[in-house]
């Protein structure tokens, strides 16, 4: 009896057919040409308003139906659909809304149109960059350790405090790599004796530089000439590496000799000003997550990963092939990567955080850092434009172009915010369109842009927060943008201040006064519009009524964004010098020394940490309440297969939660604390532990942030932190045991190689 063959699945047949068609000579060009013709036809076909409304409604329904999928093809389809809707909007704007009565009206209208063209250009480039994120996985190193390369770890510093730098140095000394194949260097542009002495004490090497020319790039170039490792790991002086950094990130460099750079994410264990100051900040992804979670991963597909200045491994041969780090701009990192790629080198990105640093503490500092970034990227755009010159593929050119021109955002952002004032103050209607036409063209364009971004960005960036980030800095960056475009050689490298405390809550007027003035003007314009609609409604012509209505709605949206940006300036107290990091680590707590045996501890009690810091640790454990005074203890843990034992003092214990402070009295203990807090291989794997974006929820969170602007002093932080659930401990307190200081029941504790 013949065997019955099962039918070939329809999807498989379709795939086979499409593959056969595309395998024909010239098929890709034919399909591309047909697709382009279809796109042009779809975006330029003339429809009545009612027909366009039907098309817009169908596109929205298609989005909701297709958007339920999770595949990469679904994302690409939604991006193409969004681009199609946006191109129809652009066609409408160019052909039907530029009907101006005066030169002033025409000038204002064209200015708005240019801002919209920039926004659409950035939208399409973002779709191009993220069309196929690579999601590169770590590659194993050779089995034979003798085949592992030599590595120089550079930690450049200029005027940062030793208390910050020493943590990074100790973390670097603890990286799991053959001791004879790694050297840790403090690159001190300040030539400070205490740094040199610390290097001697801890086992690091010290390179001082007197002239400080070319800032960080000059410091790195100075060190390259005095070192010889095959690879260079660069860490900003506050970026503390995990123990597994090199073993996770080095495999690709060893396997592929063409890779010049392996970049990893910049993760921050302290909150940035937006997270710390806004009411819902702790439930919102950090500003940098979009770049390191989505954009860099997309750039990697196009072989266009940028060097970000830290948390990156570079091949010495590649750096030397371009004459060292670029010194022509204040963003030496991106410029260096561009120069290497022009020489034919590849770059790579690994979306695994293997180091963590301090975010900018104050809004003023944050804006200053972004001003430097904007100046540097615009400088590169002027002096080494990626669209000109040789050595780059088209995908690389577009990715670099997107990065550089993204810092032009300040001028379009101000134009978008201020545009409704043209009518509310001066009666200049700069978009000649009825509300029905806006509903048919503009609203679908905005819907698809926002909704598609939410699908692509998931939990890496929430809707409407980009507008707040940009608005916070826009009025400061306008001047920088114009001056740098005109005079690219102007400007100098500014070191971003890190670390510090804020004793009292305060309002940062210096960082918010432009937006306060802007919001006041916007409020006045909105009141004028509402007054006209309320008291002169019957006297207004039909077109004037519609214009007032649209511009009042626009002004309200602008005002919401401005108020959210102003709310960031309400600086909350930061009295802890040591930032707490949420971490759940199984530990065993050994109680006070036995009488007459000062180095012997007893009563082993298991527990689970809640949060850790360089100052101490909070542990959930079955322990009686303690309120009579400090209790000497030792905290034992197993980290990455190795045991660690740290002396600590219990300050209090209540309801099963004990609070300890470290007895940090020597360098070896500090080394162990750094490893316990920052050096765990899995320390930052939950860096994107945020829910996927939902635009309406995100909008609501912005409104809550504005409400918090008017909160009573000191009230915000109590309500903004997400509440932690108590950890369930399925353990009981053990019978008394004893342990010698520096040992465990299994034997002597081994420390990280230094």
From Swiss-Prot:
Activity regulation field: Activated by bis-(3'-5') cyclic diguanylic acid (c-di-GMP).
GO terms under biological process: cellulose biosynthetic process; UDP-alpha-D-glucose metabolic process
Bias (Polar residues): 737-754
Active-site feature positions: 189, 333
Cell inner membrane in keyword set: yes
Domain of life: Bacteria
Region (Catalytic subdomain B): 317-377
EC number: 2.4.1.12
Transmembrane segments: 26-46, 47-67, 108-128, 167-187, 407-427, 430-450, 468-488, 516-536, 549-569
Region feature Catalytic subdomain A, mapped onto this chain: 147-240
Residues annotated for substrate binding in this entry: 236, 238
Segments of skewed composition (Basic residues): 717-726
Domain PilZ, residue spans: 574-679
GO MF, one annotated term: cellulose synthase (UDP-forming) activity
Entry's family note: Belongs to the glycosyltransferase 2 family.
Entry's free-text remark on domains: There are two conserved domains in the globular part of the catalytic subunit: the N-terminal domain (domain A) contains the conserved DXD motif and is possibly involved in catalysis and substrate binding. The C-terminal domain (domain B) contains the QXXRW motif and is present only in processive glycosyl transferases. It could be involved in the processivity function of the enzyme, possibly required for holding the growing glycan chain in the active site.
NCBIfam families: CelA
Function of the protein: Catalytic subunit of cellulose synthase. It polymerizes uridine 5'-diphosphate glucose to cellulose in a processive way. The thick cellulosic mats generated by this enzyme probably provide a specialized protective environment to the bacterium. Binds c-di-GMP with a dissociation constant of 30 uM.
Protein name per its UniProtKB record: Cellulose synthase catalytic subunit [UDP-forming]
Organism whose genome encodes this protein: Komagataeibacter xylinus (Gluconacetobacter xylinus)
